[in-house]
Swiss-Prot record:
Misc. remarks from the entry: Negative results: the recombinant protein does not inhibit calpain-1 (CAPN1), a C2 family cysteine protease and legumain (LGMN), a C13 family cysteine protease. Does not provoke cell death (PC3 prostrate cancer cells).
Protein name: Cystatin
Source organism: Hoplocephalus stephensii
Reported tissue expression: Expressed at a low level by the venom gland (at protein level).
Family annotation (CDD domains): CY
Molecular-function GO terms, alphabetical: cysteine-type endopeptidase inhibitor activity
Coiled-coil residue spans: none
Signal sequence segment: 1-26
Alphabetic keyword roster: Disulfide bond, Protease inhibitor, Secreted, Signal, Thiol protease inhibitor
Record-annotated Cystatin domain positions: 29-129
Positions occupied by motif Secondary area of contact: 73-77
Cysteine-cysteine disulfides: C91-C107, C120-C140
Function of the molecule: Inhibits various C1 cysteine proteases including cathepsin L, papain and cathepsin B. This protein has no toxic activity and its function in the venom is unknown. It may play a role as a housekeeping or regulatory protein.
Protein family (similarity comment): Belongs to the cystatin family.
Length: 141
C-alpha cells in the first residue's frame, strides 16, 4: 500500500511547492519590469526626451544619459513608466525647427563644473494601431 502512494505523493508535493513560490507571471493591467534595452522602451524614452525638450522652458536642450528603470502596463495599448537621467547640453533652443532626438543626443555636454543632471519620471502611452504615442505624465528634479 505504501509503495502505491509514492507516485502520487511526489507530484502533489511538487504542486504544493510551486503554489508557494512568488508569482512571476504578468498580471493583466499590472506593472511589469522591462529591460531598458527593449526596442519599445527605447522608442518610448526617445519620445519622452523629445517631448520634455518641447514642453520645458529651458533655454538649452537636455539629452538622455540613461534609462534607470522601465516598467510597462497593458492598457488600451501599452503604458511605459520610465525613470531616466537627462543632462543639459550646450545646444541652445533657437527659433525655427526644433531638434529631433538623434540631433539632441549628438549635442555636446558643458564642462563638468557646469553640468546639470535631472532625474525624470515619464509615463508614455503607446497605441501603435492608431499611430499614436503621447506623454501622459512628467516630473523632473
Amino acid at each position: 500500500m505504501l509503495h502505491s502512494q509514492l507516485p502520487v505523493a511526489a507530484p502533489l508535493r511538487l504542486l504544493c511547492a510551486l503554489l508557494l513560490l512568488p508569482s512571476v507571471t504578468m498580471i493583466p493591467g499590472g506593472l511589469s519590469p522591462r529591460s531598458v534595452t527593449d526596442p519599445d522602451v527605447q522608442e518610448a524614452a526617445e519620445f519622452a526626451v523629445q517631448e520634455y525638450n518641447a514642453l520645458s522652458a529651458n533655454a538649452y536642450y537636455y539629452k538622455q544619459l540613461r534609462i534607470v528603470e522601465a516598467q510597462s502596463q497593458v492598457v488600451t495599448g501599452a503604458k511605459y513608466y520610465l525613470t531616466m537621467e537627462l543632462m543639459k547640453t550646450k545646444c541652445a533652443k533657437t527659433t525655427g525647427k526644433p531638434k529631433v532626438y538623434k540631433e539632441i543626443q549628438n549635442c555636446e555636454l558643458p564642462p563638468k563644473a557646469q553640468q546639470e543632471k535631472l532625474t525624470c519620471r515619464f509615463q508614455v502611452w503607446s497605441r501603435p494601431w492608431l499611430e499614436k504615442i503621447e506623454l501622459t505624465k512628467m516630473s523632473c528634479n
